[in-house]
Amino acid sequence: MSHVQLDAIGYHLPDGRALLHDVSLRVGEGSKTALIGPNGTGKTTLLRIIAGDADPHDGAVTRGGQLGVMRQFIGSVRDDSTVRDLLLSVAPDRIRRAAEHLDRAELALMECDSEQDQIKYAQALADWADVGGYEFETQCDVHTTAALGIPYELARFRGVNTLSGGQQKRLVLESLLGGPHQVLLLDEPDNYLDVPAKRWLEERLVESPKTILFVSHDRELINRAAGQIATLEPTRAGSTLWVHPGSFTTYHQARADRNAKLAELRRRWDEQRAALRDLVLMYRQKAAYNSDMASRLQAAETRLRRFDEAGPPEAVPLRQNVRMRLAGGRTAKRAVIADNLELTGLTRPFDTELWYGDRVAVLGGNGTGKSHFLRLLACGGTDPELDQLPVGDMIPEPVNHDGRLRLGARVRPGWFAQTHHHAGLMDRTLLDILHHGDERRAGHGREQASRILDRYGLAPSAEQTFSSLSGGQQGRFQILLLELMGSTLLLLDEPTDNLDLHSAEALEDALAAFDGTVIAVTHDRWFARTFTRFLIFGEDGKVRESVEPQWV
C-alpha cells in the first residue's frame, strides 16, 4: 500500500539549532497533502528526509510504494544537461542504472569496437529492454510532445537550459504524474507555471490515484487539489507540524481555533504549576518549625516533580508577525493616462485611464508586455515630472514605445521588480541599504533600521547582503523599501511569487489600507481576487479591460 509515515521526526542544523521537532504525519494511499509553512521552517528539509537524501536525528520514516521526487531546483536548471538527462533523473532507479550502463557500453564501443565491447554493448541493450527501457522511451515521447510540442527523438539531446522554467516544470510533472511511481514528493511544482498550466496541474493532482505530498504557496492550488493541509509552524524547540483535515477555505478559522485552544491549555497548565509550587513553598515553611509537616512536604514535592516530568502541553506556535505599513498619499484624481500607447513589438495601441485609489490587476500570458507596461510606469511614463523620475537603487531600463503614458500630479511610482535584480542592492547588507538613504527615502540609524527590519521578519538577516537572501526575503525587503519611499503609486510585478502564505496575506492587508493606486502584474489567482479592475494583455497584442479576472 502506497503511503508516507513520519513518526516524531527531529532534525538539527549544523550549528546545533533545532529545525524540526517531534514532526509526525501520515499521507495515506491516494491522498493529496499540501505542506505549507513560513520560509525557513524546514519544508524542503522534510521532503529530503522523506526522500532519503537526509537522515533525521530523531524519529523514523516509513514509505510504501515506489517514490518519485521533484526537487526545488527544477525550473532553474542552467547546466549543460539534456532533456534525456532530466527525464532519467526522475525515472525509476532500475531505468536510470540501465541507462548509465548502456551509455558507458556505447561510449566504449565507439572508442574501441573490440569483440568484448560489442558483447558488453549487446548485453547492455538486453538489460535496457529487460527493465522496460524501450517502454520508458515511448512514454518520454508522450511527455515531450505534451510539454514541449515535439517528439522525444527531436527533444532528447536538447539542452535543458534552452527550456523556460515552465517547460522544465511541465516536462518533469508529465513524467512523474504519468510514470510508474506510486508516491510523489513535489517541491513547489507550480513555480514558473502560468495559470493554464496551474489549472492543468490541479486537474492532474485531483484525478491521480497516486499518493502525493507537495509544497506550495499557491492558495488556489492548495484549495483545489489538497485533501489535507500539513503546516510546519515555528516554536522555540523547532518547527512542529499540525494537520488540517480540510480545504484552504476553512484553514484559517481552524488554525485560529487550534491556537486559542493551545493557549488556553498552556494558561491552565501554568496556573496548576503555580498552585503546586505555592503548596510546596507553604509546606517547606511549615516543616521548618513543625516536623509533622515533613510528610506533606514530601508528597507536595512529589506531585510537583511528576507534574513537571509530564511536561507542558503542546507549545503555541510563534507568531509570524510581519507588519507592512504602506502609507501612500492623496494624488490627482486621474493617476495614470495612456493615450494611444503602444509597447513596441508587444502591444497594439490602447487607451486607458486609472484613477486615484484604483486596484488594477494586469493579467495575460508570458511575453505580452505586462512587465514592460509596469517598467514604463516606473520610469515615470513618457514625460515624467522631476519628482516622478526613478531614483536610488531601483532604476528600471527604458521601454521602447509610441504614444503617451502620463502620471497625474503627486503620483510618485514605487516599483517592485519581478526578478528582484537591482545592481545597486546586490552586494550590500540590509542595514547598509537602510542606513544610506536616497532622494526618496531618508537614512536610518542602526536601532531604527533594526526595528523596521523586525516588522518584516528580517532582523536576523540584517547583516546579510541582499543577494544572499532567499526569494521570499528579497520580496519582503523590496516591499519595505516601497514603504520608506512614500510612493503613491505601487507597481508590483509578481509580488507574491516567492512570499510564503503569511507574508502574502500581510501584503494584502497592507494594500487594503494603502492610500493610493495599486497596479500589479500577477498569476496568483487568489491574490487577483482582491483587485477591482483588470487589464488583460492578449496574445494578439490587444489590451482590454475586464470586470473580472480572465486567464489565457
From Swiss-Prot:
Residues the entry annotates as binding ATP: 37-44, 364-371
Signal peptide: none
Enzyme class, spelled out: hydrolase
Boundaries of every ABC transporter domain copy: 4-270, 332-552
Induction: Expression is up-regulated more significantly after exposure to macrolides (erythromycin, azithromycin and clarithromycin) than after exposure to other ribosome-targeting antibiotics.
InterPro entries for this protein: AAA+_ATPase (IPR003593), ABC_transporter-like_ATP-bd (IPR003439), ABCF_EF3_subfamily (IPR050611), P-loop_NTPase (IPR027417)
GO biological process: response to antibiotic
Substrates-to-products reaction catalysed: ATP + H2O = ADP + phosphate + H(+)
Highest taxon of source: Bacteria
Transmembrane segments: none
An example molecular function term from Gene Ontology annotations: ATP binding
The name this protein goes by in its record: Antibiotic resistance protein MAB_2355c
